[in-house]
Amino acid sequence: MSPPTQVRAIALDVDGVLTDGGFWWGPNGEEFKRFHFLDVMGIARGRRSGLLFALISGEDSPLVDRFAKKVGIEDVYTGCKDKAAALRTFAARNALELSAVCFMGDDVNDLGAMALAGVAAAPANAHQKVLEQVTIVTTRSGGSGAVRELIDVLAAAGRLTISYDSPARS
């Protein structure tokens, strides 16, 4: 799979990519997820530079919608049993060629979407079958700034343009 000249969008799995993949519940059954500020800042920088983002999650959690709202991501697909179909929908909705989309996932249920994307990426702690299929493996684990690292790697390779010299709003 050869990377496109320019990545115009990044689609992300949530659990295991933007979070550490753990499930945390409070004493009254409330759910918690921990997101890393490096990822929040990377997404903010990317959005300010014109990069589109989507969240594609197998889980149906209101926390995913809340995170998306916080960082300004409008394309959110939760409860996905077919992440490849969600990726196709995201690309069509935004008039994107799939070759201009990067997908980052961490487990075997992400492989279908990864096969469609122009660039497939995974955090360091992804499942071995995923690590064998991707173009980019970050040194950071999911939930520890892996998305920010991916954005920085793509920018350094000339695959996207990110502005780092002005403050970003998160």
How would you name each of these model-derived features?
Residues 29-33, 69-71, 75-77, 84-170:
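Mg2+-dependent phosphoryl-transfer enzymes with acidic/Ser/Thr/Gly-rich catalytic loops
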